[in-house]
Amino acid sequence: MIIRSLELKNIRSYESGRVEFDDGVTLFEGDIGSGKTTLLLAVEFALFGLGDQRGDSLLRATSNSGSVKLTFTVDGEEYTVYRELKRGSSGVQQGELYIRKQGVVKKLSAKELKAEVLEILGYREPLNPRARSRIYRYAVFTPQEQMKSIIEAPKNDRLERLRKAFDLEKYSRAADNANLVSRRIRRESESLEDRSYDLEDKKRELEGLLGEKEKLESEKKQLDSDIEGIEAEIAKLKSEMEVLQREKNRIESAEREIESLQNEIETLRSSSERLMERNRSIEEEYRRSLDELQKCSDIREKLQEELNSLGERISALELKRESLMDDSRRFREASIQYRNLVSELENLIKTGRDLEDEISGLEDYTDRIKSKIESMESIEDPGYTEDEVEAGIRKLEVEVSDLQQELGGIHGKIEDYESIGRRGVCPTCDQEVNPDYINDKLSSARERKGSVESRIADLRNEIMNKNELMKRIAEYKRSREELRLLREDLEKRIKECHRRRESLDNIRERIRQIEEGKAESEKLIEELKDAESDFNKVEHELKSLREMESGYSSKLAAASGRMDQLRTRITELNPETSREYRDNLKKIDENESNIAEKRAKIRENEEALKNRDEVESSIHDLTQSICEMENLRDEKRDRRAAVEGKIEEKQRQIGNLESEIAKKRELRKRARELGNYVTWLNEYFIPAMDDIETHVMAQINHEFNERFQKWFRVLVDDPGKSVRIDEDFTPIVEQDGYEQNLEYLSGGERTSIALAYRLALNMVVQRLTDVRSDILILDEPTDGFSKEQLYKLRDIFDELESRQIILVSHEEELENLADHIYRVEKSDGTSIIEKTG
């Protein structure tokens, strides 16, 4: 990770600030308490959130909101993280949070943003937003106070904190979790044992149920045998019953056949009677048809005579009608023509009156237009164009504006002269001024003022006159356009009036022609009015005779048709020639023959009815025997069903018991398996975790000691003095083979030990977490250093090979080691950052 920029707003002592970071060594220098460490805390807050600290420890006391924006790169990819703090009724909480990557802004919650940052940095840590980043705190940035507290803390506290830094707590957590799991498994195993305590009792209960079931199955087997014998006897009796039943069916069939034959005989008798009645009806209808045929013949002859008489009268009237038809046609044509001429005449008279009214209206309208044209032609041309007048107005307005400016200057001079006259001293040179000179100046200025004001008034009057002229020009242009439109309208109206007069003349000529035709039609109608009346009378009489002729013809046709029907029917009804009559006689003979045959069959069936009582008695006895055997069989079946129910109940009980026994066996088996797990956890896994932690801690101690000694030798050039750490990571200083208390060391030596301890811790944590960090942050690492020790820091930086190192110090001598220098100062409680190198 490489930091590129940091922006703060209302964070601790900062109202606002921005820092640009580059590769190399960046130094933040300033007095103690100026706000240098706040920058480092802001970086940590931007990356990981508040952690276990309170929001009001970061938010400026006088502000209700603040924010930090951090831009950094990882593997060449740039990211920007933004976190906001807001003060509310419940305290200071995080507000808007987002991350920008690949140009896309994504708003997240505190937990989601921390997870995103940890994934980008490759830190494998818990996602709890209220926990600090262990890797960052020990591999990148360790505050000065925290490092001193680690070194000076009691050994148990120091070991506990270093175990967290080295992530060795996972072994003790694993052992503690194993203990919890072991206790839970033991409780589960004991619970399973309790649930399977009565397994042997259940087995004995199962054996008893199996014995009872065996006895019931033996009883069922005997009942099956008894039922089988009874059903065989029932089958034998039913076979005998079937023989008797067939005989009974034969008797019942004979009874039904006798009844059927008797019904058929009765039907045949009824049929013969109907046939004889039908023949008598045919003979009667034959006689009636002969009488009706004679009557129809008489009526037909009378109708034919009447029809012949009507035909002669119709022929005479048709001759008369032909002679009157031509006169009647001419009369109708003359009447139609007369009505059409009258209608057209009325329409033409009305149209003529309308045209006369329209012509009168057009003449009045054209007179009014001519009068208006004469009035508008009297309007005189002003003699100027609008552009000319507008140019004149603009010129006058410019002159007025210039004069007003001059008038303003004159007013100022008059006020100055009056002021000098009152004071008697020139405000520019502070010399006395002659009053006469000032009075002359005042008179001259006032005279010029009056002249200018008079000229302005004249110019304004002239502008007003030109505006009036503009109105007259506009009025003249409007009148010219309106005059053009009126002349065009007048021309159209005159042409329209001329067309209407021509139409009126045409209508008057047509009226004269219609009146002549009307007189001719009236004369012809008068001559032919009697011919039409005579023709209508003949037409009416002819129509009446034809209707009578049609009626007689219909009656004659009906009489002829009825006679044809009667002749056909007489032929059909003649007993000598009628097929139906002869067929009826034949069917009567056949019915008598069939009746004799059916009576013979009745006598045959009556022989079969003699043994009916004997068959019915045998059937009754067999039915009683079968019923008794079936009752016995049903009793046996009921007993067998009861036994089967008991067997099923026993089988259900056995199944439930076997299932319960199987479950209890599984519970006991599972309890023993869980007991084995408890033994493995307590006797093998938990001790192994302790051994692994001890072994890993020893390896870390060895590596830490080597790095601690290496960095101390670089910082302290004293061959007689050496350092090491014991098994509790306590730093031990030896001088010429004797241990030396840390309290007796110089300030520079104690700082060297703390810095060497910090660098060793950073490098070990980086290796253990497999995090390759390109950045190192050191907070006040040189307190008490000599100049020689300060210069040795450059060797340490070169050996660390970090792309970016951030130093916070109040030592100005570190400027020689820094590539980029920022000065932090505090004024009136507000910190300010300024780049100085």
Curated annotation (Swiss-Prot):
Keyword Transport: no
Binding site for Zn(2+): C426, C429
GO BP: any one term: double-strand break repair
Residue ranges the record marks as coiled coil: 197-419, 462-551, 634-673
Pfam families linked: AAA_23
UniProt cofactor(s): Zn(2+)
Subunit structure: Homodimer. Forms a heterotetramer composed of two Mre11 subunits and two Rad50 subunits.
Role, per record: Part of the Rad50/Mre11 complex, which is involved in the early steps of DNA double-strand break (DSB) repair. The complex may facilitate opening of the processed DNA ends to aid in the recruitment of HerA and NurA. Rad50 controls the balance between DNA end bridging and DNA resection via ATP-dependent structural rearrangements of the Rad50/Mre11 complex.
Record family assignment: Belongs to the SMC family. RAD50 subfamily.
Entry protein name: DNA double-strand break repair Rad50 ATPase
Species of the source: Methanothermobacter thermautotrophicus (strain ATCC 29096 / DSM 1053 / JCM 10044 / NBRC 100330 / Delta H)
